[in-house]
């Protein structure tokens, strides 16, 4: 009573196959597709009894990964979705329900994890291994974004990004990367071809943090201020809110070192160009005394972790606001489908909606781009949060 189709990811192929299946299968047979991004509504458009057509999107490797996206098209019957959820639960899987929109839940909400890494690489903020170490070892993601695209396959990852970008009418949040396109054109597809962002034919060296600062700045006067600011003698160590260290140093007339989110053993910093060398070294010394491995990148608004996480949260809120899936299902999908350390909406509540809003507004101001515009649900939650605080 169930068919699961896993043909090539081309709409015309799937439409033809489903039209044939509808002719030969009894009317009660559920017709499902394992597509990762093609519209269920489009696949079912010419099928007899389209209410029995739905998506069952498994994640690789399917025997191991628990998540299944149960996707309804415009005509899919509610009882069909219910049956599929019960069935996947009986297989030991965890279903999440979503409507047929580009990328469903996971392939849509995960796009900023890749796109922000490509942007950092394009702007020569840091080497690939530093970008990956910051997200992996500093934020708790299971793999860095660039090494993950090498593992997925640059051609596959790039094709999904292009598909989502075009399906959303060239929405700038999903803009593909020219650097990734060059890799695909050049046949550097990642681990499967031996070359991608990394050379997989050779053993990769572990990322090493900055050398230990030997100068003894002790005793230092350290005072933790509010909102992520630590005063170390005359130096301000500021957790990023989307401004560059240089802009802050000029405005505050003080040496400034900006630090990314300090959740793990690895922390990433950026220093204002106007800083005396001793001021930056003092901040590094302070962090190393806290047992942190310190990585330094170019002065970059929002840094690596904060801007990536903020964009993921913003995308999850946009999907929630537009009825793609429930809050619980979005969080479950991202934890089980791509092993994020937290569901993005729970993460947003933990980090603070006002802080995320402020960071995105600062990024939008810095770049003058629609890419970083906060969704209206983020604004609503930030306003509600400020009301509770007052």
What residue spans do the PLM features occupy?
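NAD(P)-dependent Rossmann-like dehydrogenase/reductase catalytic/cofactor-binding core
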Residues: 93-100, 112, 123, 128-390
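Rossmann-fold NAD(P)-binding glycine/threonine-rich loop
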Residues: 10-87, 231-289
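N-terminal Rossmann-like NAD(P) cofactor-binding module of classical short-chain dehydrogenase/reductase
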Residues: 1-4, 237
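Conserved anion/nucleotide-ligand pocket segment
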Residues: 91-94, 101-108, 117-120
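Rossmann-like dinucleotide-binding domain for NAD(H)/NADP(H)
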Residues: 64-67, 113, 120
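Rossmann-like dinucleotide-binding cores of NAD(P)H-dependent redox enzymes
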Residues: 72-77, 102-110
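Residues immediately C-terminal
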Residues: 5, 9
């Amino acid at each position: 009573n169930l068919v699961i189709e896993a043909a090539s990811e081309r709409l015309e192929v799937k439409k033809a196959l489903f039209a044939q299946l509808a002719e030969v299968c009894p009317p009660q047979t559920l017709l499902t597709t394992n597509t990762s991004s093609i519209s269920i509504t489009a696949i079912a458009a010419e099928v007899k009894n389209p209410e029995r057509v739905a998506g069952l999107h498994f994640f690789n490797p399917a025997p191991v990964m628990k998540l299944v996206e149960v996707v309804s098209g415009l005509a899919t019957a509610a009882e069909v979705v219910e049956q599929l959820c019960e069935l996947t639960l009986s297989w030991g899987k965890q279903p999440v329900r979503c409507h047929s929109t580009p990328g469903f839940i996971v392939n849509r909400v995960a796009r900023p994890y890749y796109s922000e890494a490509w942007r950092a690489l394009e702007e020569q903020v840091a080497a690939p291994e530093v970008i990956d170490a910051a997200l992996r070892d500093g934020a708790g993601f299971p793999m860095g974004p660039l090494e993950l695209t090498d593992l997925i396959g640059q051609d596959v990852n790039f094709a999904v990004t292009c598909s989502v970008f075009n399906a959303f009418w060239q929405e700038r949040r999903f803009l593909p990367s020219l650097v990734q396109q060059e890799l695909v054109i050049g046949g550097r597809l990642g681990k499967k071809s031996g070359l991608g962002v990394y050379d997989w034919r050779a053993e990769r060296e572990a990322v090493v943090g900055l050398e230990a600062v030997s100068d003894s700045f002790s005793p230092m006067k350290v005072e933790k201020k509010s909102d992520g600011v630590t005063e170390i003698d005359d130096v301000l160590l500021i957790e990023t809110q989307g401004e560059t260290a240089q802009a802050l140093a000029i405005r505050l007339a003080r040496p400034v070192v900006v630090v990314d989110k300090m959740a793990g053993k690895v922390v990433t910093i950026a220093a204002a160009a106007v800083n005396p060398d001793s001021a930056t070294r003092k901040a590094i010394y302070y962090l190393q005394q806290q047992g942190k491995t310190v990585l330094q990148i170019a002065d970059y608004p929002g840094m690596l972790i904060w801007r990536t996480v903020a964009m993921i949260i913003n995308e999850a809120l946009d999907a929630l606001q537009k009825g793609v899936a429930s809050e619980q299902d979005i969080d479950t999908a991202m934890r089980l489908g791509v092993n994020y350390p937290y569901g993005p909406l729970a993460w947003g509540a933990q980090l603070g909606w006002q802080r995320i809003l402020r960071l995105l507004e600062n990024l939008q101001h810095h770049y003058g781009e629609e890419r970083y515009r906060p969704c209206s649900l983020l604004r609503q939650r930030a306003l509600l949060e400020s009301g509770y605080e007052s």
